Amino acid sequence: TFTTALTSIALASSVSLANANEISVGGKNFTEQQILATMTTQYLDNLGYDVDSRSGMGSAILRQAQENGQIDLYWEYTGTSLINYNDISESLSPEETYQRVKELDAEKGLTWLEPSEANNTYALAMREAAAEESGIETLSDLADAVNNEQGLTFALNAEFYAREDGWRPLMEAYDFRVGRSEVSRMDTGLVYQALRNEEVDV
C-alpha cells in the first residue's frame, strides 16, 4: 500500500463562527469533498447561520481563496497542506503532521479544527478480471508488470500526478517507469469512468 505523508482530514477555518453573520463553505471538485461541503453547509444552516456554499473548486484555487478571505472554511487534508502549501517533505506521523500544519498555517491566519477520524489515502485500482489475468495483487506486482513491458495504461488525477509524494515518488520507490504516453491525466471522477470503460488498465 502506498500512503501519503499523512491521512488526517480537518476543517481549516479563517473565521470565528461566534462572530460571523454569513459563512462561506468551500469544497474541492471531487465527490468526497462535495459530500463534506454539503454536510457542513447543512449543519451550519441548522444552527442558524447564513451559509454560502462554494464547492467544486480546484485545490490550489480553494486554498488561495481562503487565504484571501473569500472562503471561510473547508475540509483540508493535512498532508496536502504540509507538502503543497508549506513545502515540507519530511516523513511525519499523522499527529506530528497535524501539529506542524496547525502551527504553520496559524502564521497565515488559518485555524485547524480538531481532525476527523477519516483516513484519506491514495491507492491504485484495476478491474478485477484484468488484475487476476495479469497476476497483479500488489504494487510490487504492478511494477514487475510494467518492467516486463505488459503495456499497461494509467489514468491519474492531476493532483496525484504532480504531488511531491505522488506518482513520480511512487515509481521511484517501486523502481518502475511509465512513459507519458501511457498516462492520461484527468478529473478524479473521469478516472473511474475510464477504468470502468476499459479505456485504461490502472
Enumerate the predicted regions with their spans:
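Extracytoplasmic "Venus flytrap"
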Residues: E22-T38, M57-S59, E159-A162
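A conserved helix-loop-strand patch within extracytoplasmic ligand-binding domains
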Residues: T97-T153
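Pocket-flanking alpha-helical
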Residues: S59-E90, T97-V101, A106, G189-L195, ...
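Sec/Tat signal peptide C-region and signal peptidase I cleavage site
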Residues: V15-A20
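Ligand-binding pocket segment of bilobal, Venus flytrap-like solute-binding proteins
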Residues: I71, E149-V202
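A structural preference for short, hydrophobic beta-strand core positions in alpha/beta folds
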Residues: S53-S55, R180
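Bacterial N-terminal signal peptides
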Residues: T3-S14
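Short, polar/charged alpha-helical segment
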Residues: T31-D50, Q66, E164, R168-E172
